[in-house]
């Protein structure tokens, strides 16, 4: 029993940073600051933003995905997987951080900032694929991706419930503020987990990635 508990403890210590990174990724779904979010779309429409303008913003967001796929390999090559992922995530969050304050006078800055943030979001999405490939053993990747997807749905459900509680266009700035708070927490969680992964000194009994399943 003692050796089994030791094995579980070693496994938890080894996998904890990756769990934190997956949790950070999932937190990104706890936000309405997106060019395709229905709550944000309804708010922008209530503020007089035309359907054509919203369509243009969504098209720009789609094109930003191409830029994100160009950006991530360069960040990864220059900084490394975890530092590059952290940079992409923080740039995404910093682009959206001013949104709640700007809503007091116009919805236009929100459209601009959301569009500017998209390449970094796409880059971070690709970064998480790299993280799972590099830090999770092949036999566990499917389970890890599945658990991450479930967590994403739970955070999306949480922001939807908050949107119901804060319904009405006059309360959208508060909802945007909560979204920025969730994004900031995501970036902090990822950075802390990446730092833990980098600084964690592998003891003599550390479990190599390829041997997780034997613990």
Predicted region positions:
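Juxtamembrane intracellular "pre-TM" segments in multi-pass secondary transporters
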Residues: 1-24, 46, 212-215
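Intrinsic disorder in cytosolic terminal tails and internal cytosolic loops
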Residues: 195-215
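Short amphipathic helix-loop junctions that connect adjacent transmembrane helices
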Residues: 37-54
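Substrate-agnostic recognition of the 12-TM MFS/MFS-like secondary transporter fold
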Residues: 1, 26-38, 57-76, 88, ...
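C-terminal ends and interior cores of transmembrane alpha-helices
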Residues: 90-105
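Cytoplasmic membrane-interface "Motif A"-like loop-to-helix N-cap segments
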Residues: 77-92, 173
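A membrane-interface helix-boundary motif in multi-pass transporters
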Residues: 163-187
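Alpha-helical transmembrane segments of multi-pass secondary-active solute transporters
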Residues: 54, 84-85, 144, 174-179
């Amino acid at each position: 029993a003692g050796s089994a508990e030791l094995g579980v403890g070693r496994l938890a210590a080894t996998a904890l940073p990756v769990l934190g990174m997956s949790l950070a990724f999932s937190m990104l779904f706890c936000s309405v600051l997106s060019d395709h979010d229905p709550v944000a779309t309804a708010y922008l429409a209530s503020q007089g933003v035309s359907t054509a303008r919203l369509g243009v913003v969504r098209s720009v967001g789609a094109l930003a995905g191409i830029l994100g796929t160009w950006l991530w390999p360069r960040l990864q090559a220059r900084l490394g997987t975890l530092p590059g992922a952290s940079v992409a995530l923080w740039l995404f969050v910093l682009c959206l951080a001013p949104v709640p304050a700007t809503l007091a006078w116009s919805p236009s800055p929100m459209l601009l900032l959301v569009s500017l943030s998209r390449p970094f979001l796409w880059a971070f999405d690709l970064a998480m694929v790299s993280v799972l490939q590099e830090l999770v053993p092949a036999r566990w990747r499917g389970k890890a991706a599945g658990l991450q997807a479930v967590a994403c749905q739970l955070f999306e459900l949480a922001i939807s419930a908050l949107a119901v509680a804060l319904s009405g266009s006059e309360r959208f700035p508060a909802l945007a503020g909560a979204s920025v708070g969730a994004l900031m927490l995501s970036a902090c969680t990822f950075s802390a987990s990446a730092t833990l992964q980098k600084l964690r000194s592998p003891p003599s009994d550390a479990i190599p990635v390829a041997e997780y399943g034997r613990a």
